[in-house]
């Protein structure tokens, strides 16, 4: 049975209802509040401990600034439930009034008042109530808390909104440029200077803004403001007029190349481009009316990198048409041709892509570019079913550039094209020689596995075992790869051993996989085979793996940053719900992008306490990938729950009951589709937690009376309801094996039905490996792994039903 839902307020605000005492900065060992685990036992040990770094002495208790055992976001206070409810309803003004009322009745301690004032100021500002926001920010800025700089910038924003730009500079002057908060002050200073007509100061401030922003809508908006200010300055002859106009022209064009820019911003950028051209003298107008070849290449590349392939192809076509014939073979012209072919292939215009690559190969001589073009031409031909042409291109790459990093890729894909043509002997010959011909090639494990898989499919188990033994003896084959590959060769080697009569050796390998790779796809595959052979033995191995997990806390290494003011600011920002700026503070400390598990676990818990499932899950997922051999037992149970969170429980459990879909599968789909980001958007125009496209959502929403527009699909209550409905519809399409709803969710129901017709009654593990779409194949493995993890963590009594995969597809 599914567990009952947690209270809605706890879901929303990250209430501290878990057992983790986490990373303490006030002591080296933190005790854990005991609570009942799902199995009804009391936690044996504190799951988180902070240990001194190996190269430093322990941090004395009296010198530590903060302790996460004392950290509690303001809105988890039960007395502020009305504030949280108003925020959830999207009414920050009501939330501000609720908070003011509560403060009048329950004054906080003097040392804590700044937190409530800062939250109050943020609520007023979000509601557009700038006068009371200014008052509340001023109370914070007059103190000495870690939030003083943020309050001063808040004052500056409020003053600007109230039409008092002259006072903005005074409020912002005390904010150090070395603090992360500085990125917030520059837009305010720029706008204040622009409003006052000080265009030079505005331009300088906007340039500061751009230094802190990467590509995206926010940067595009700042570039647009800078372009406008430059053109305004040029209009009145302030500064170097031609230089200002040309810079504005460049910015306007760059905006049009950036991904995910709102349509209104794009239209404004086009208008600024036209205005800039109009301001140029006639000779310069003619010179700059069209982008020069280098600018055209950058535009095509930007669109291609953003995977906006239709636009990239259109831009490439226009660029090539404008290029003189003599420049087609230049480095710029050749690169545009390559990107054009790549865009055509991405939009499935394979024949045209092949023609473009053929043209490039006839004109361009750069060895690296030719190798890329030959490889891409081969892949386009193979995708178009032109396997002889694909073989020709792959062979040409190997012959012309045998040392190129794509040469072993070409060998693999060429062999697969031979297999598609039924030329088994050549397929075998090419892949058998791959390890010797390309001993350092990164495709050696994959090519060898594909050879072994073919032999397994033909029931040549001895041949498969020999190939896999060679792979497992190759150090490269055990190098770090994505988690869904972990254990693949070991599992199928055991399968081959079992089929050749070495049953006990095979069963021993299955046991090792169960111990070594908890809840991974190939652990589930191994458990399923072992369970079919001896269910009690499988259960005993699982029990021993759990018993082997070390007791005691998950250790977080102490760092000097934990006692610094930057970390203190991050904690305070998380406490008042400003997750974005809190994360920036951690990033400035070099913590947010850490690859060290002991740091990531601490960050994950901090994010969870602050109420961000998205950030918490991301950090924990990275941490768990670095320690994949630790089963979720004792302290590690809560660690795994951070990597596999269960938010929106009331909605999920309601929809699971309504549709007959288990919550473990719903959460697994959600985790793999959006990583728990309600605002997620894909390049295929899929939206929200379960990544629905509008036409699919509309067909499910109509009978339920629910909206299905883009904005509504970003609301968890709508998205989960419709996504679960789609999952149920797909499961009903495969009554003999509802798990085929998983590949159907990714690739559409028609493809799994076709694959079933092509391979009826196939072994389930081989059927999954032979899914022709790489994305779908890997997706199925990840979802099955996540589904089992959710069952283990939240439905333990029912876990075995999720751990045992079907032996056949039907």
Labelled PLM ranges:
Residues 4, 17, 28, 32-684, ...:
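Acidic, polar-rich low-complexity tracts and alpha-helical solenoid repeat scaffolds
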